[in-house]
């Protein structure tokens, strides 16, 4: 059984026991359980359920493993012939989840 969920403006294919990194979820701490309600699709063997746009009765339960920062993204600006250079870095906050169950 797998599901397609939407969180942080992105869609993820999840199964029980899978861990994934999503955009930061506010107000949660490591070890806490979260319920993801935006389930777009459910697949269980032969049966496939597609939401319009979401499946109201479906829930995905996940455990927060950690809140951390993602990899550094470097932004480099340069103007030709003028010697202007600017290097800037950015690290986005992310939440690591482990899927514990899919409820239909």
UniProtKB/Swiss-Prot annotation:
GO terms for biological process: translation. Pfam families: Ribosomal_L21p (PF00829). One of its GO terms (molecular function) is rRNA binding. GO terms for cellular component: cytoplasm; ribonucleoprotein complex; ribosome. It comes from the Bacteria. Keywords: Ribonucleoprotein, Ribosomal protein, RNA-binding, rRNA-binding. Belongs to the bacterial ribosomal protein bL21 family. This protein binds to 23S rRNA in the presence of protein L20. Part of the 50S ribosomal subunit. Contacts protein L20. This is Large ribosomal subunit protein bL21. It comes from Endomicrobium trichonymphae. The gene is rplU.
């Amino acid at each position: 059984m797998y599901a397609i969920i939407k969180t942080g403006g992105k869609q993820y294919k999840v199964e029980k026991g899978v861990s994934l990194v999503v955009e930061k979820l506010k107000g949660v701490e490591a070890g806490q359980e979260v319920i993801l309600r935006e389930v777009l699709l459910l697949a269980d063997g032969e049966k496939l359920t597609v939401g319009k746009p979401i499946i109201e009765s479906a829930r995905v339960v996940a455990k927060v493993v950690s809140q951390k920062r993602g990899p550094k993204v470097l932004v480099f600006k340069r103007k030709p012939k003028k010697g202007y250079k600017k290097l800037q870095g950015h690290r986005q906050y992310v939440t690591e989840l482990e899927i514990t169950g899919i409820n239909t």
